[in-house]
């Protein structure tokens, strides 16, 4: 089977369930942005993969990557086809919240805004965070056209918090001072 079908050559694509839409459709923009995020998360995971002491973060990120595939599929469901994709479980959101809570407990509280950076892997966390926030905005645009699952909206909202805190935690792991924003 060839990877190309030529069915998208005129700017259309097919959602799960058979609905044909323009590639600029809000749902396509939403799952495309989550797909973009997954590439950045994979890069972040690869940066940490052989770092001593980072195995737990790699495991979390691999789990998040798997969850992202589910989210992409859910966002790609058309008017028909919801029976073809497993929903995102509430447990998935609860697991992510627990990971966020753990990361937050491992870093000192902040009373000021910080500037991203200080280490390439920390910067990668902030790229993931900002692309995640864009994905969330795209999901809400798609939600106006066709309601999107509440679990997806909650999960993507939490995910940007996860990347922010992972960046903070990695700053401490690498011994990098968090840079304070001074207006």
Which role fits each region the language model picked out?
Residues 1-183:
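Phosphate/pyrophosphate-binding loop motifs in nucleotide- or prenyl diphosphate-using proteins
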